[in-house]
Regions:
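Rossmann-like NAD(P)(H) cofactor-binding subdomain of soluble oxidoreductases
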Residues: 99-168
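Histidine-anchored nucleotide/phosphate-binding helix
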Residues: 22-32
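N-terminal Rossmann NAD(P)H-binding glycine-rich loop of SDR-like oxidoreductase domains
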Residues: 11-14
Length: 340
């Protein structure tokens, strides 16, 4: 077991996703069986009791890897020495709220958190934003931590979209989820995202597009299923879960966040996965936007890197461009608020 514990900060620590995260992190699911962790739970004052109750439960679990748990409503205390920051807490959109109002509310959350990360976090901190709108919230946090914390240390969660896409393909093709590689989520974590299977392959080397055509009776049928069923269902899966379950995704979101950090820290293995990272102009995406790309990580401390070289046909380029247009509009709205 490593001698120095890794400090992991979870914002929204008293909320349902934070609750689902903390026990798996303490059990070693995120950083492995040999890395002790110190958990810091950040909450707003009215959420403190829930977070304190979760901390009591963590103590009762007696996890060997869990060194200690701190609960606080002070960002400077929460992010002090943080090596990994998982920004879960966000202002949800309510009925009648305009996008500009939502962005302004979240700027008031993620801006100060970015400043606190800059002030007191570990010099090699890595940050993943889970709270929506995740891509632009990550942009806000990164801008607020600049220039001392490089923007490349910030990412936003699209692993949930990635996993949803893999799950839908696995169900259609009657294969295990682990038998599918190189699915890509492009763009924003929103209804404009583009789940791309044109480069995906099965464990036996068969392209997923061929497997779909074989199962559905031809390439035209496969294309129709992708356009009319698969892409809309992945993009709107969150709304479907709310309708069926009566509340938003919790366990699947927490699982995706854990996998995002695990692969970034320990290595992503075979093929590519998806994460929203700061663009450096890859695939024509404007520099500085936080956009979902195909990524890999060697687990060597350098985080995710965008994998270039995937061909995009006209259809894919149009879908990516539409999602990028939305990201640009969100960035411009935040700039108009004077945040960036």
């Amino acid at each position: 077991m490593a001698s120095e514990p890794t400090t992991v900060t979870i914002t929204g620590g008293g909320g349902p996703i934070g609750y689902a995260l903390m026990f798996r992190i303490a059990a070693g699911d995120m950083l492995g069986p040999d890395r002790p962790v110190r958990l810091r739970l950040l909450e707003i004052p009215q959420g403190m009791r829930a977070a304190e109750g979760a901390a009591l439960e963590l103590q009762d679990c007696a996890f060997p890897l869990l060194v200690d748990v701190d609960v606080t409503d002070d960002p400077l205390t929460a992010f002090n020495g943080a090596r990994i920051a998982m920004l879960v807490g966000a202002r949800p959109r309510t009925a009648g709220m305009e996008r500009g109002d939502l962005l302004a509310a979240n700027a008031g959350i993620f801006g100060p958190q970015g400043k606190a990360i800059d002030a007191v976090a570990d010099e090699d901190v890595r940050v993943v934003v889970v709270g929506n709108p995740a891509n632009t919230n990550a942009l806000i946090a990164a801008a607020s931590a600049a220039p001392d914390v490089p923007a490349d240390r910030f990412s936003a969660l699209t692993r949930l979209d990635h996993n949803r896409a893999v799950g839908q393909l696995a169900e259609m093709l009657q294969v295990g989820a682990g038998d599918i590689a190189d699915v890509i989520i492009w763009g924003n974590h929103s209804a404009t995202q583009f789940p791309d299977v044109s480069h995906a392959i099965l464990a036996d080397g068969m392209p997923v597009l061929e497997a779909l055509a074989e199962r559905l009776g031809g390439q035209d049928q496969a294309t129709a299923w992708l356009d009319d069923v698969f892409i809309p269902r992945v993009a709107k899966r969150g709304a479907e879960i709310i309708e069926v379950r009566g509340s938003s995704s919790v366990a699947s979101a927490a699982n995706a966040a854990i996998e995002h950090v695990r692969d970034e820290q320990l290595g992503s293995g075979r093929g590519v996965t998806s994460a929203a990272v700061v663009s450096h102009g890859e695939y024509g995406v404007p520099e500085g936007l936080v956009c979902s790309f195909p990524v890999t990580s060697r687990g060597d401390g350098h985080g995710y890197r965008v994998v270039e070289g995937f061909d995009l046909d006209d259809r894919a380029r149009r879908r990516l461009a539409a999602s990028v247009e939305e990201l640009v509009a969100e960035r411009d709205a935040v700039q108009a608020l004077g945040v960036l």
